[in-house]
Amino acid sequence: MRNRLYASRYIELNDPMEGQYYYNKGELNKSVRRKISSDKGDLRLCSLSRKKDNELMWSHYADGHHGIVIGLTVDRGKFDVRPIQYTGLHYLTGGQIEQDTPREILSHKLEVWSYEEEERVFVADKFYVDIQVREVITGRAMSNQDFGFIRELIDKINPSINLIKADTFM
């Protein structure tokens, strides 16, 4: 309703390896590792997918096709949006960190997650990311009653939002 998404801390995400990284023993002293940890903790992020027709995503994140997918736009001029690199955990070399290091660490995931085709929106000073909702896609297993509720809600909030049933393209 307010055209925004909650931005989570990385520790609130579902991947237990989130925020982990590799480094050579002795290259990063304890104070540098603490600084990285603190800087990662200061960031908030939204995890988004580029795909709306991925069966696994619907099963894992949309209540087994009973839920919805929201098609949205993020202003890339206003927010730092980065594609996830599925090359494993980020590898830090040298004893120095850059201002961008925490975002780089949080932009790497294990290859097993690559089906998500994820992009992340990073914010450091906000709890929300402004978005523009373009479409709402309802799951193939959504009840008629729930679909009707979603239809009424969209009509009241913003009738220009497209309502699409997933079974029309999956």
Task: Give the residues covered by each predicted segment.
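Partner-binding and oligomerization surfaces adjacent to conserved cores of proteins
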Residues: M1-M170
